[in-house]
Amino acid sequence: MAVDKGLDEAEGLPLGEATFRALREALRSGIYKPGDRLREEEVAERLKVSRTPVREAFGRLVSKGLVVPGQGRGLIVRRLDQTEVVELYAMREILEGAAARLAAKHASGPEVDALRDLEEGFEKATSADEMARFNRLFHECIFASSRNRYLDSALQELQDAIALLGRTTFTVEARPVAAFREHRDLIEAIAAQDADKADALARAHIRESLRARLRIMQQG
């Protein structure tokens, strides 16, 4: 749900929930980046809602640790420090390895085809941000293919923290090519129903992503 559109299409959801989901998606997609300021009146105007559901959504974002009060009015999107980043990737390695293992056992033919289509989109992407979008969809497809609602829920929570990382690792030299190769090998392991290999490849993929992330952080 784009952050600059109204919430008319969010039928069946309380307005506060729809507003929260719109803001969370804006964070995940990089519309709002670490350090950006969110103001009630601006968000309300963009989403065409009153300030009451925005205030409710802001409270949930604060409770989840995604934003912090800024000086003056509004909230600031948090930026993770290096310790938090290392902890986040350690958890990603465990959970995404488990998701890949389960996907190798449960993924359907159409789901494997969807992974291949997403990887083709990643390969053809012309910008780092576009690669990041396909990458997120790729990983979410694996989460869904795991057939484990609790694991999927935990991984979705991590997606919120990933939104606080800032610049995509696909801006690091040679990382897009390496990530494409890692994704391709992971797809083949899932397609072959090789759970051990899929787990190991997913974990290695996250470790390589962490190395690229730390390079970005060292550059400042």
Model regions: which residues?
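Conserved amphipathic alpha-helical segments that form helical-bundle/coiled-coil interaction surfaces
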Residues: A98, K105-T168, F180-A189, K197-R207
